[in-house]
Amino acid sequence: MSTYPVTLPTKEERHKLFGSVPPIKGTKPTEKDKMIDLQNTPKNFLFALDAVGISNVKHPVVIQDGETTQATIATFELSTSLVQDRKGINMSRLTEQLDQYHNEGWVVTNESLIQFARELAERMEQSEGQLTIRYPWFFTRKAPATGLSGLMNAEVWQTVSVNTETNEATLSVGLTINVTTLCPCSKEISEYSAHNQRGYVTMEASLRDEADDFNWKQELLDAAESNASAPLHPVLKRPDEKRVTEMAYENPRFVEDMVRLIAADLYEMDPIASFFVECRNEETIHQHDAIARITFDKDAQ
């Protein structure tokens, strides 16, 4: 045990005690224009690369939410292609551009993401730019009987790829939301009651060029919740809980039922060109989960 008072050396001496050493007198240049630029030195580096960049970048953003906007925290992946005769890209330009957009009051929309990806490619002097942005989207949910409201959230994402040589852009959007599912088999064979579980519905859709006015977050949310046994709620009083319990019993769903019903809704949405749907149920009477998936391309039919 240490004894008090303790006589301490200066902070500089303490750092030396624990291994700090003074900087050496270097011989390499400290001015940027005199430094060797390894990334841009031309040479045959064997292969061109599809994507080079940074991921897991946390940043505050403002998103478009219907007729309003919403502030949230997003996770970015930013990348560009890389030609064969360049060793790498200047990655600092990626976060530099993100900070520039943020300081200019950027509102995230499908159109502004396409412009962002195009500018990434141009800054890097590459032909392709890509980005993925993920964030929690918050929305208000009212209880079914009392009308009491609270906030819900869904995980959403947008992925953009732009080719500056062909001027082509692809855009896909996705959403994951939790729902209630009640087992049809349990309801059918039991004298009373039925087991239910929390289902995780994940949807991803490729959008057509004419999808500018498509409120994709709300449409995907509705596709999942309207086909579930019951949606989730942040606030439920006893009259609400009774309503939700009975609603689930009236609408039993297997995971297979969920993905087929959601697929039917997405198929009817003209702005969607192709889609992926997955439902995963955390089973209450098993240790394992139940899953079902479907991938469908309307243009390939």
From Swiss-Prot:
A GO molecular-function annotation: GTP cyclohydrolase I activity
Sites marked May be catalytically important: 183
UniProt keywords, alphabetically: Hydrolase
Span of the signal peptide: none
UniProt xrefs under InterPro entries: GTP_cyclohydrolase_FolE2, GTP_cyclohydrolase_FolE2/MptA
Enzyme Commission number: 3.5.4.16
Any GO BP annotation: tetrahydrofolate biosynthetic process
Gene3D superfamilies: Urate Oxidase (3.10.270.10)
Residue intervals passing through the bilayer: none
Pfam families membership: GCHY-1 (PF02649)
Reactions this protein catalyses: GTP + H2O = 7,8-dihydroneopterin 3'-triphosphate + formate + H(+)
Class of this enzyme: hydrolase
Pathway in which this enzyme or protein is active: Cofactor biosynthesis; 7,8-dihydroneopterin triphosphate biosynthesis; 7,8-dihydroneopterin triphosphate from GTP: step 1/1
Protein purpose: Converts GTP to 7,8-dihydroneopterin triphosphate.
Membership in a protein family: Belongs to the GTP cyclohydrolase IV family.
Alphabetical list of PANTHER family matching this protein: GTP CYCLOHYDROLASE MPTA
Name of the protein in its database record: GTP cyclohydrolase FolE2
The organism of origin for this protein: Exiguobacterium sibiricum (strain DSM 17290 / CCUG 55495 / CIP 109462 / JCM 13490 / 255-15)
